[in-house]
Amino acid sequence: MSEYKYCVGIMSGTSLDGIDVALCKIRGSGLDTDVKLIDCQTYPYPTNLLCDIKKSLDLSTSNAQLLCSLNFKLGIEYANAVKKLVAANNLNLKDIAFIASHGQTIYHQANNERGFIKSSLQLGDAATIAYECQTTVVSNFRAGDIAAGGDGAPLVPYVDYLLYRDKDKSRALHNIGGIANTTIIPKNANIDDIYAFDTGPGNMMINRSMEVLFNQDYDKGGDTAAAGIVIVDMLQELLDNPYLKQKPPKSTGRELFGINYTDKIIAKYKQNKPEDIVHTLTIFTAQSIVRAYKDFVFNKNKLDQIIFTGGGAYNKFLIKTISDLLDVEVLTFEDIGESSDAKEAIAFAVLGNETLNKSYNNIPSATGAKSRVILGQINFF
């Protein structure tokens, strides 16, 4: 097998909780991929940049000038994050073979409707990152899948298959970021056996309620939710969301479960205690995940374990609620000796490596694409 090379994966998700940057060593490709995490850090967005991102997400405050400028501001910020992590590990930028950057999702149009076609926009100019870091950058991963008729999401299942398949255990890898998504990997699977989809909201609605009601970024450990009780009418309204009944492959985003929707729910039930609203949103998130397994997975596959990753894996109340509702072993990434925070940044490093090796790196059964394609666009340096 080839020698290890240093690479960096960058992920900034819909939770807007910062820039996850993973410094890795990688060699091989495809089923022979061998990747080792050296270090991963999350760098918070500067306040003014976070403000610009939030403006760009709201149709009432977004505009072309803002998006144009933000694209390059994010490129500079991502490059600065890479420089910090590389220096902290006593390496030089010239040691880095490539960077793979997902970018900051601004809008994800999952369906053709009202004259709009399937599309997805991630900002964070790759040419700027390449110039600032003096290395090759792979970016814009979702476009290739959308061009092939897919949703452009979820993309991480390909990496889940490469790194976490098992000949004896059927498992699901479930990421709880802003949106929650699952990858189903039957035991002894080949790539055509894999399927994946977005189950619904992850941290998105919980985080927004904490911001509005408690002026906090998130519910640490789920402590606020644990102090509340269910608002029955509110929970039923949330569970009636049509997305939960939609069959996979499917994907969603803040367009459906973001600020506008969450704020309407909070306003409608504002006469209730704040902790009860957070509790109910957390129960809804848990039940949307559980329903996804009961409606779309268990009738096809008997799972031995579900492994949770992402920021939501640290919400103890959320994970316990899910575990109590499922008759299957529930683990977090930390339980298997890995980092929930680092998983998606590592995944995009692997996807970038596949791109540079000219390997197909989408899974049509997950995204709905007509065929397998090579994802990512390359800025050589």
Swiss-Prot record:
InterPro entries, per database record: Anhydro_N_Ac-Mur_kinase, ATPase_NBD
Catalytic activity: 1,6-anhydro-N-acetyl-beta-muramate + ATP + H2O = N-acetyl-D-muramate 6-phosphate + ADP + H(+)
GO terms assigned for molecular function: ATP binding; kinase activity; phosphotransferase activity, alcohol group as acceptor
One BP term from GO: amino sugar metabolic process
Keyword ATP-binding in annotation: yes
Main EC class the enzyme belongs to: transferase
Residues annotated as binding ATP: G13, T14, S15, L16, D17, G18, I19, D20
CDD domains: ASKHA_NBD_ANMK (cd24050)
Pathway linked to the protein: Amino-sugar metabolism; 1,6-anhydro-N-acetylmuramate degradation; Cell wall biogenesis; peptidoglycan recycling
Role summary: Catalyzes the specific phosphorylation of 1,6-anhydro-N-acetylmuramic acid (anhMurNAc) with the simultaneous cleavage of the 1,6-anhydro ring, generating MurNAc-6-P. Is required for the utilization of anhMurNAc either imported from the medium or derived from its own cell wall murein, and thus plays a role in cell wall recycling.
Family statement drawn from the similarity comment of this UniProt entry: Belongs to the anhydro-N-acetylmuramic acid kinase family.
Record's protein name: Anhydro-N-acetylmuramic acid kinase
Organism encoding this protein: Francisella tularensis subsp. novicida (strain U112)
Taxonomic placement: Bacteria, Pseudomonadati, Pseudomonadota, Gammaproteobacteria, Thiotrichales
